[in-house]
């Protein structure tokens, strides 16, 4: 009864007003799955290809009708008749159909839309929530959220170099409390910024995007907001950064325009991070080095890898092959997991499995162009990832993931697990 009878894709809009793909998969039993595909602003060079039309007369060239046609005319024909419960077989079939390293023929957006919709249809067929279907009986850990409350870099039109300044309510006793703490700090931060005469407009991911005197001032106002909300920095709430430093790297030099000394070598940039880690309760830095600066990554891991989580995003692009190379070379100690960087659910699960076996932490992540789809909330619980990064405490495209996690926590009830600071299991205990 789980045979696929129809697959249909359409073009919809994402949270930035750009087109993206939505796919529906129908089964013989009447079960159905629907999935929408996200899109990134700062992307890694080795990410799977997001297929766009390039027709400047339509959606400024960003239409996805080619990807829609690839689903409706090519992929559908091949997967109709297959069992939706054969996730690996279906994903493998699509990879064979595409036949390219970066999914550039059919488009990773086309392939991922089908891959996720198939999983949702199969879950519907067997009467399970998506997290239970993917993860089985042991899927029970709610993730510690990384909440992006100040946006800079490619995610905002301001003068802040670092792309994301995040809070992690690690002192919370459960996910619902972590969410409440995050929301209260978010509102306190708005008040702090207003009091200093700063703009409180928000960026792509719902964080504030003011022009600040320095990157460090962003940390200062966040600390002030944490205290104003009645919490203790370093105890109740930890900080995390996403530097997206590939965007700052050119000709072997990193340029942080908002710093007194903008030009920095890899060593000087690591000094800069070390100073911040000594001064503020920073537990995690993502993409601290450019994706091709493996020497810089190695140095950063050696100097800071016992103290903080060093996350590879553009570095690893959720790709098991690249991750294996990083593990072998002792680079980073954590991987950011983005479904559309690799393009199938199966390959995503392979990357998570490999990371966990190597003692790397995993952070399930959204993209800056999101939709109302909440798959990644379910995925974070399915694999007991321990951490999720899905934006700020406003904008429905971000909050819908948090709300789905509240539902999952309710459903799991007494079985639900929330580990707070213990998610950083691979760091040296202080």
Swiss-Prot record:
Active site as annotated: 205 (proton donor), 338 (proton acceptor)
SMART domains, sorted: Enolase_C, Enolase_N
GO biological process per UniProt: glycolytic process
Cofactor comment text: Binds a second Mg(2+) ion via substrate during catalysis.
Transmembrane segments: none
Cellular location(s): Cytoplasm; Secreted; Cell surface
Principal EC category: lyase
Domain of life of the native organism: Bacteria
Cofactor: Mg(2+)
Reaction(s) catalysed (UniProt annotation): (2R)-2-phosphoglycerate = phosphoenolpyruvate + H2O
Any one Gene Ontology cellular component term annotated for this protein: extracellular region
Residues noted as binding Mg(2+) in the record, renumbered to the chain: 242, 286, 313
Similarity annotation: Belongs to the enolase family.
Its biological purpose: Catalyzes the reversible conversion of 2-phosphoglycerate (2-PG) into phosphoenolpyruvate (PEP). It is essential for the degradation of carbohydrates via glycolysis.
HAMAP family in the record: Enolase
Full protein name: Enolase
Annotated organism of origin: Geotalea daltonii (strain DSM 22248 / JCM 15807 / FRC-32)
Lineage: Bacteria, Pseudomonadati, Thermodesulfobacteriota, Desulfuromonadia, Geobacterales
